[in-house]
């Protein structure tokens, strides 16, 4: 899913060059909006997939709900790492979180 997002941005680069002199502001806004939409879609797609996968592996609905927002932040910060080690990141984060709660 991240690949599709990257392709969208790549395809915009060549189209942005000729439109640069026509209307920079307009082109920039479009890029931003498309980028945001792309990130949002990516976020939802990965989150949904993560929910299903984690549900099968670990039976903890409460933990999953707490983890969802964390996954969203990770996606924006390091989308590549999320794709490669999606499950690893999720499990690694669940370990320290429960320990912090009693503290």
From Swiss-Prot:
GO terms for biological process: cell differentiation; chromosome condensation; flagellated sperm motility; spermatogenesis. It comes from the Eukaryota. Its main location: nucleus. Residues 1-103 are annotated as: Disordered. Residues 10-21 have a biased composition (Low complexity). Residues 78-90 have a biased composition (Basic and acidic residues). It is found in: Nucleus; Chromosome. The keyword Phosphoprotein applies. GO terms for molecular function: DNA binding. The modification Phosphoserine is found at residue 95. InterPro entries: PRMP3. GO terms for cellular component: cytoplasm; nucleosome; nucleus. Keywords: Chromosome, Developmental protein, Differentiation, DNA condensation, DNA-binding, Nucleosome core, Nucleus, Phosphoprotein, Spermatogenesis. Residues 50-66 have a biased composition (Acidic residues). Belongs to the protamine P3 family. Protamines substitute for histones in the chromatin of sperm during the haploid phase of spermatogenesis. They compact sperm DNA into a highly condensed, stable and inactive complex. PANTHER family: PROTAMINE-3 (PTHR14317:SF0), SPERM PROTAMINE P3 (PTHR14317). This is Protamine-3.
